[in-house]
Amino acid sequence: GEYGGGDVIVWDWGTWSHAKPGDPLKAIEEGDLHFDLQGQKLAGRFVLVRRDRDTSGKEQWLLLHKNDDSAVPGWDPEEHPRSVKTGLTNDEVAAAPEALWRSDLPAGEASVALGHSPPPVWEGPTEEELAALDALGKGGTWEVRGRELKLTNLDKVLFPAGDDGRPVTKREIVRYYAVIAPWMLPYLYDRPLNTHRYPNGVDKPGFWHKEVPSHAPEWLQQWHNTEADPGETRCYAVVDSVPALAWMANFGALELHAWTSRLPGVHQPTWALIDVDPGTTSTFDDVLVLARLYRTALEHLGVVGTPKVTGQRGVQIWIPIGEGYSFSDTRAWVEKVSRAVGHTVPELVSWQWHKDRREGLARLDYTQNAINKTLVAPFSPRPAPGAPVSVPIRWDELDDPDLRPDRWTIRTVLDRLAAAGDPLAPLIG
């Protein structure tokens, strides 16, 4: 945007709070304001101090970062010039006048509203960009949507062959993440991300990875969790672009789990999650019986939600939550509904926490409704042969005799979307 003849970006995004008792305006008048920031770039305790006036009589202020757990030695804001919203620098905004906000235009043309607005609409890679990816050797630099990505080991097999008899390479996963981005990014946008990495392929042990690595590109959006205890993750990736999603693929993050809360209000859930988690003796027919009972219960309650096959053995149900509810609220509500469903067919359900005590029965898991508890994101691959994908479905598809939890893969889900769309998409935002 433009303000007073200069270009302006949203350099950081988050919340602030006065750190001392009393009126913050009075603290400013007294020249000593202590406050806490919880932003995507700046976090921790800050002090704004008034110094002596300069020779012209103008006030001088000094901004200090206290030496707390959020302080990073040598961190220079000048080395992080990009907007947390657009990824652009001031110079790039100034060079793109069509992206500027104009005070002489109607307010109705503003592109960003305060609060949680619906996510933007993303365009996938061009045919030329995809052709360039296909033409790379085992590795190289790929330019996509204005960013350069250094890709490695593109011919490495990451998924064994599935029903079609063809294994899935890293190149194909990078390509999939890029082309699925317009469908997947709305579920990742403005949310901290937990990733399940399989850098050596899904037939080798994977591991959870949450902390942004030091070699991540500067333009990858990040969120600093100032509430993290020692030893916990402090810096999370926030995937909000086609290049960021493709970078995750190259990083070996083959399974993506976004938080159910959005920045900056990480304590306020936007989804309530129901997870029909099958036991060792549960059949998919058992899972469908339970999912249909949830369908009946939600219809009776007048609650809107959408089921999603997990890409492995289960079914999840995602329910949008309005403002004003806590994780305790959503967890208690999902537990109440789940116990009503479970008591209808007690022969299918166990309430035991440990899997080895469930006698092979399904668990109706309501405990994922908590901060930093996640379920696999829509359209994320799952670690199984053929690279199956977690896909939202319509309620009536629970009655489809051909439905399987791993029915769609990275090679078939785009045809599914072209034919049926995403039934969960209208509930985002």
Regions found by a protein language model. Give the residues of each.
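Short, flexible loop/turn elements at secondary-structure junctions
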Residues: G39-K41, D52, N67, D155, ...
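Short, conserved phosphate-binding/catalytic loop or strand-edge motifs used
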Residues: V309-I319
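Short beta-strand
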Residues: H196-Y198, G305-G311, Q352-D356
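SsDNA-processing nucleotidyl-transfer enzymes
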Residues: G1-G22, L133-G146, K150, R166, ...
